[in-house]
Amino acid sequence: MYSMMMETDLHSPGPQTNTNPGQTGPNSGSKANQDRVKRPMNAFMVWSRGQRRKMAQENPKMHNSEISKRLGAEWKVMSEAEKRPFIDEAKRLRAMHMKEHPDYKYRPRRKTKTLLKKDKYSLAGGLLGGAGGGVGMSPAGVGQRLESPGGHGGSASAGYAHMNGWANGTYSGQVAAAAAAAAMMQEAQLAYSQHPGSGSHHHHAHHHHPHNPQPMHRYDMTALQYSPISNSQSYMSASPSGYGGISYTQHQNSSVATSAAIGTLSSLVKSEPNISPPVTTHSRGPCPGDLREMISMYLPTGESGDPSVQSRLHALPQHYQSTTAGVNGTVPLTHI
């Protein structure tokens, strides 16, 4: 229907211009005719003049746009024989117009109203799609924060958020808050990985990188499974491939160091399958108090009393301190 109305507007000056002299008075109509020469009516306009007046008398409350839609639909279903007299009349009017105005050239006026209306609708559609009723705004911002430290632009981050389904506004406020916390942890991880180091950087990264991704992947598990608490087995099976594929391949300079780190990590996980990674990462070396509290908030409490876990936790900080002492003599994560 909208395309038919556009065709009508393209072929003719519009039905409103014909009724202007009757509505505003003869003086203003004559002034308008003196200033601007109207285009000759096409066949549809010749036919719709009488039909529009008739339909307006039958339905006085009907809007003009609805009348135009109905007239356009009627004109399309009419046969060529029914259209023929109106086509001939339009040709006669065009010939008369060419005689009266031989130097006439059609100069289309700027349709500022239609352009503004289209821009308004497109803007509203974009806001509805991006905001999703107000809930999806913060996940979209999280997508930007996740992508911006890596050097991507705003358009890429918007596409990233849409691809992952964050911007449809169907998630609850708790998931949005979880995503915001995950973005903070991702920023901390990226800032730490860009910290300058020496040749033993891959050992250092291997022992300290799991501090950051663990809460982020825990949020991912809750978002995917729609459950408040994810069990440790599914978490353990999902986390090595998750951050092993992302953090190591993105932040290590050597592929040999990458494969060695992943191999060590997989053997570490396979050797003790009953111990979840969050417990081991909780006591790995010195880290800031707020980060430790943030991680320990999501740890299962029942496994911390296991004696094998305690002996392993006592051995890990010594190994961590011996490996991190060679990296420029600095304590990691103090700049976050």
Curated annotation (Swiss-Prot):
UniProt KW keywords: Activator, Developmental protein, DNA-binding, Nucleus, Transcription, Transcription regulation
Extent of Polar residues compositional bias: 14-32
SUPFAM superfamilies, per the entry: HMG-box
Motif position, 9aaTAD: 293-301
Region described as Disordered: spans on this chain: 1-39, 193-216
GO CC, alphabetical: nucleus; transcription regulator complex
Protein's cellular compartments: Nucleus
A Pfam entry, by short name: HMG_box
Keyword Transit peptide: no
One function term, GO molecular function aspect: DNA-binding transcription activator activity, RNA polymerase II-specific
Bias (Basic residues) ranges: 200-211
CDD domains, per the entry: HMG-box_SoxB
Tissue: First detected at the tail bud stage in the forebrain. At the 3-somite stage, also expressed weakly in the hindbrain. At the 12-somite stage, strongly expressed in the forebrain and weakly expressed throughout the central nervous system. At the 21-somite stage, also expressed in the lens.
Main subcellular location: nucleus
DNA-binding region residue numbers: 37-105
GO biological process assignments: brain development; determination of left/right symmetry; negative regulation of transcription by RNA polymerase II; neuron differentiation; positive regulation of transcription by RNA polymerase II
Described function: Transcriptional activator.
UniProt remark on domains: The 9aaTAD motif is a transactivation domain present in a large number of yeast and animal transcription factors.
This protein's name: Transcription factor Sox-1a
Taxonomic classification: Eukaryota, Metazoa, Chordata, Craniata, Vertebrata
Gene transcribed to yield this protein: sox1a
